[in-house]
C-alpha cells in the first residue's frame, strides 16, 4: 500500500513537470539543475502527492485579506504589518515564496526578494498603496532562488533603490551561481552591488521610527538564515526555517541547527509566524512543525543505527497522524534522511 502511494505520487509529479515546462520554469538544462533540488521543484513535488482539498487548505487565509492575485495573497496580520502568502500551485510563480511588509513612521521593510522581479515590484506597489511609501529596506531571509532572485524589481520608478539587507554569506551565495541560487547575470550583480550587511553573529535592528524590527541571525535551512521579528507587534517572519503544512526542504539543511533555530523562534508563543511557504502559522502550527522535525530525527537516527540507507528509511517513513496533515513525497523525505546521514557522519 505504501509503495503504491509513492508510485502514484511520482506519476502525478511527472504530469505536473510537463506543466512546469509549459510555463517556462524549466527552460534549459541550466534552469533544471538550478531548481530540481531546490524549493521550486520541492514545492511542486510535495503538492503533487496531495489531494485537491489539501492543496487548497495549504495556503488558506486565517487573517483579513487585502488583495488577491493569481500568484499571491496579501493578508493583514498585525497593525501596519502584512504577510505575502504565495499561491504557486495555480501555475503563476511570480512571487513563489512568502514575504511581507512591515511599515513604520520613518520607513517600510519589504521581506524577501521573491522569484521574479515582477513579484518584488508588485509588493513595492502594494506597500506604497497601503502606507504611502515605497519600501526603504528589503531584508532577505536566505539566498535560494525563490526568495532572492527578484530583488531588482524593488527599484522605484524614479530610480531610487531600497537598502538591500543580507548577511555576507547570503549575498555571496545569491550571486555565486550555485545550483539553487538565482541565475547569475549582470542584472543580478547590479542588484546586489550595495548590500547592507546584516550581522551574522548578533541581533541587529532597523529603526522605523515608531517601531524597532529585529534581525535575528540563525542557520539550519541554509548556512545563513535571518528571521525578522517585531516583539511589540508579536510577528515573526521565519523564512524557510518554517514550513507550514508541507514537508520541509533539506537540500541545504543542517538538521541540528534547523531544530535549534526553530526552537529559538518558537519560544515567542504569542507571535504570528510567517514561514517561507504555506499559510500563516500560530503557536499550535509551529508546535506541530517542531514535532515533525523531531520525528524526522527519530526515524533517521533509528534507521541509520540499524544500518539502513537514507532511501530505505524514506521508503518506510510516514508522518504520524498525530502531527496533522503534511504534504510529503518520498524524494523530499529521502533528502531529509540524507541530510541527517551527513550530519551524523
Give, region by region, the residue ranges found by the protein language model.
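Conserved beta-strand hairpin/beta-sheet module of binuclear metal-dependent hydrolase folds
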Residues: 75-126, 227-239
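Short acidic-hydrophobic surface loop/beta-edge motif
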Residues: 74-77, 102, 202-208, 275
Amino acid at each position: 500500500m505504501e509503495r503504491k502511494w509513492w508510485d502514484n505520487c511520482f506519476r502525478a509529479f511527472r504530469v505536473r513537470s510537463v506543466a512546469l515546462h509549459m510555463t517556462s520554469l524549466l527552460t534549459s538544462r541550466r534552469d533544471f539543475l538550478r531548481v530540481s533540488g531546490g524549493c521550486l521543484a520541492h514545492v511542486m513535488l510535495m503538492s503533487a502527492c496531495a489531494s485537491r482539498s489539501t492543496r487548497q487548505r495549504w495556503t488558506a487565509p486565517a487573517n483579513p485579506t487585502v488583495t488577491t492575485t493569481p500568484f499571491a495573497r496579501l493578508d493583514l496580520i498585525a497593525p501596519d504589518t502584512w504577510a505575502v502568502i504565495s499561491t504557486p500551485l495555480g501555475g503563476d510563480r511570480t512571487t513563489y515564496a512568502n514575504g511581507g511588509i512591515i511599515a513604520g513612521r520613518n520607513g517600510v521593510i519589504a521581506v524577501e526578494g521573491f522569484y521574479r522581479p515582477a513579484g518584488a515590484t508588485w509588493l513595492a506597489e502594494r506597500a506604497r498603496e497601503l502606507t504611502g511609501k515605497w519600501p526603504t529596506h528589503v531584508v532577505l531571509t536566505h539566498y535560494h532562488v525563490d526568495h532572492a532572485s527578484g530583488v531588482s524589481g524593488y527599484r522605484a520608478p524614479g530610480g531610487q533603490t531600497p537598502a538591500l539587507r543580507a548577511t555576507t554569506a547570503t549575498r555571496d551565495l545569491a550571486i555565486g551561481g550555485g545550483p539553487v541560487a538565482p541565475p547569475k547575470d549582470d542584472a543580478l550583480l547590479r542588484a546586489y552591488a550595495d548590500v547592507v550587511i546584516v550581522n551574522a553573529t548578533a541581533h541587529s535592528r532597523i529603526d522605523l521610527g515608531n517601531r524597532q524590527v529585529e534581525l535575528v541571525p540563525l542557520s539550519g535551512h541554509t548556512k545563513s538564515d535571518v528571521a525578522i521579528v517585531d516583539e511589540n507587534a508579536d510577528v515573526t517572519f521565519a523564512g524557510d526555517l518554517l514550513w507550514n503544512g508541507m514537508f520541509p526542504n533539506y537540500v541545504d539543511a543542517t538538521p541540528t541547527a534547523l531544530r535549534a533555530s526553530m526552537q529559538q523562534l518558537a519560544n515567542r508563543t504569542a507571535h504570528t509566524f510567517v514561514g517561507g511557504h504555506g499559510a500563516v502559522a500560530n503557536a499550535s502550527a509551529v508546535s506541530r512543525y517542531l514535532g515533525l522535525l523531531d520525528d524526522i530525527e527519530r526515524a533517521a537516527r533509528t534507521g541509520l543505527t540499524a544500518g539502513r540507507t537514507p532511501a530505505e528509511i524514506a521508503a518506510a517513513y510516514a508522518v504520524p497522524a498525530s502531527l496533522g496533515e503534511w504534504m510529503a513525497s518520498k524524494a523530499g523525505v529521502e533528502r531529509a534522511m540524507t541530510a541527517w546521514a551527513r550530519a551524523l557522519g
